[in-house]
Amino acid sequence: LLQAVCDEDFLALASGLREIMQLPDPKARIDALMMGYARFALHHPNHYRLMFMTPRAPCNQDITQIQQGNTEQDAYVQLKTVVQNAFDAGLFKPELDDFELIAQTLWAGIHGVCSLEIALGHEPWINWKNLETRIEHMQSAILQGVLRNPDAH
C-alpha cells in the first residue's frame, strides 16, 4: 500500500516536471527543474515528507507502477537527463567530470531548503528569511559552484 501511495506521488512529481524537459536552453532547464522540484515539495509538504523525509523500505521493483529510466515517469532520470545534456554541452567546470554527482548535488541543495521549510518553517527560534529568496539563493550558490560560466545565460 505504501508503495502505491509513493508511486502516485512520484508520478505526480515527474508529470509536473515533464514540460521542463522541452525547454531548449540547458541552463534554463536546470533552473526550471530545480524550481519545479521546490514548488512540488512546498505545495505538497505531506506527500514530500513521505517521499523524501521518512525512512522506508527501498522501492520494490516488482510492484512499482513507475518504469525506472522512463523520463515520462521517473523524476530522478529527468534530473539526470537535464544535467547530462548540460554536461554534454560543456556547461560545467572541467574538473567536474561526473554528471550524476552533479545531479545529486543540485538535488541535495534544493532538498535541504525544502525539507528545512517543511520541518522547521514555523519554528520561532529561527528568524527565517523569505522562502523564495532562500530557494533562489541556494540555487544560485550551487550553480555558481558548478557552472563554467554561471552568468553566461
Where do the PLM segments sit?
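Amphipathic, non-membrane alpha-helical segments in soluble helical-bundle scaffolds
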Residues: 2-3, 7, 27, 68-76, ...
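Hydrophobic/aromatic-rich alpha-helical bundle segments in the mid-to-C-terminal region
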Residues: 63-65, 88-138, 149-153
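Hydrophobic alpha-helical connector segments
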Residues: 18-47, 93, 99-106
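An amphipathic alpha-helix adjacent to DNA-recognition modules
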Residues: 1-18, 31, 35, 76
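An amphipathic alpha-helix signature
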Residues: 31, 35, 76, 80-84, ...
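Solvent-exposed, amphipathic alpha-helical segments
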Residues: 12-23, 109-116
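Short secondary-structure transition hinges
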Residues: 39, 43-81, 85, 91-92, ...
